[in-house]
A protein has these predicted regions:
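A domain-start/cap signature at the N-terminus of enzymes
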Residues: 20-107, 188, 193, 254-264
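Gly/Ser-rich "nucleophile elbow"/oxyanion-hole loop immediately N-terminal to the catalytic nucleophile
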Residues: 98-103, 152-184
């Protein structure tokens, strides 16, 4: 726990240097984590460098892949999708051992904050954030992809879309269970993805971030969105999340949805100061990694 709090503080400190509450929660619910835990933290050689027999070729939604050769806590590290249109896309991937392509699996994409971008070092996204690991406690039959992109703008958004399309084409994926999460700058990137291709996803969890993408496509696709952020987030503040929530809420009202129907699709979850300080965290923005351990937050995502 002490190590985790130190990591949270360091991530927040980096974000504050780089520029990278009263609780409001209009929807509870969600599934509880299952009981299987991750393995140790040691980086190991991947057996034969093999990731999946299906990850060798493709055309739109595909491309050639250079597979990683090391494993960290169940993730094959630093695979590279070579996309003709979007360049080299680095990512880590967790594929359950029992996956053989005969049954459809869920798919989860987790995008990191500034401290986890590729230029910070291979694997820094997994070393500094826990979303990719705690997700495994909720859904066992799920492939988890942790891209390491270069920024939080349009280029990274397009690369994320290309990578999602690749997995949808080359793996047996249950299209009704495709989940996205973005923390800080990763949330900005994923919001751009949502503004471009929301129909790729079932639900999106935006953590300690702001919305940079379009809204209308999200309302049209009915992709569920939850905004979770500290009331006094030191980088973004909570107001951008409130405004994004209100914009989507207004769009749904114009389409004639009832409040009950809107609540199924849209959640504004503002955490007060006590949420962080009671868990030993003084810096709300860096403390966003606590959301990875929050059953209500993560359970909501994987219940959709």
């Amino acid at each position: 726990m002490k190590k985790k709090l130190i990591n949270i503080f360091l991530a927040g400190l980096i974000l504050s240097v780089t520029g990278c509450g009263n609780t409001e929660n209009n929807s509870a619910g969600g599934i509880q984590p299952q009981t299987e835990k991750s393995s140790g933290d040691t980086v190991q050689e991947a057996e034969g460098g093999e990731m999946s027999e299906e990850t060798s070729e493709g055309t739109n939604g595909s491309g050639s892949v250079t597979e990683g050769t090391e494993v960290y806590r169940g993730f094959i590290m630093d695979n590279v999708l070579h996309s003709e249109s979007d360049g080299d896309i680095h990512y880590h991937v967790h594929i359950p051992e029992r996956y053989d392509g005969s049954e459809p699996y869920a798919l989860f994409f987790t995008l990191p904050g500034y401290e986890g971008l590729y230029f910070q070092g291979v694997g820094e996204n997994l070393y500094s954030e826990d979303f990719g690991f705690t997700a495994q406690e909720y859904v066992k039959d799920m492939i988890i992809v942790a891209p390491q992109l270069s920024d939080w703008g349009e280029t990274s958004a397009d690369q994320t879309i290309a990578l999602v399309e690749y997995f949808l084409k080359n793996y047996n994926i249950d299209r009704s269970r495709v989940y996205g999460e973005g923390y800080s700058g990763g949330g900005e990137t994923m919001s751009l993805v949502m503004g471009k291709r929301p129909e790729l996803f079932t639900a999106y969890l935006q953590c300690s971030s702001q919305w940079d993408g379009a809204y209308e496509p999200v309302a049209e696709s009915r992709t569920a969105v939850r905004f979770v952020i500290g009331e006094e987030d030191e980088y973004y503040g909570s107001q951008p999340s409130r405004e994004a929530y209100n914009t989507l809420h207004d769009l749904y009202e114009k389409e004639g949805l009832s409040q009950e129907e809107i609540d199924e699709l849209l959640v504004l979850d503002i955490k007060d100061e006590d949420y962080f300080t009671s868990q030993g965290v003084a810096y709300q923005h860096g403390g966003g990694n606590l959301f990875a351990e929050d059953d209500q937050v993560m359970g909501w995502l994987f219940s959709k």
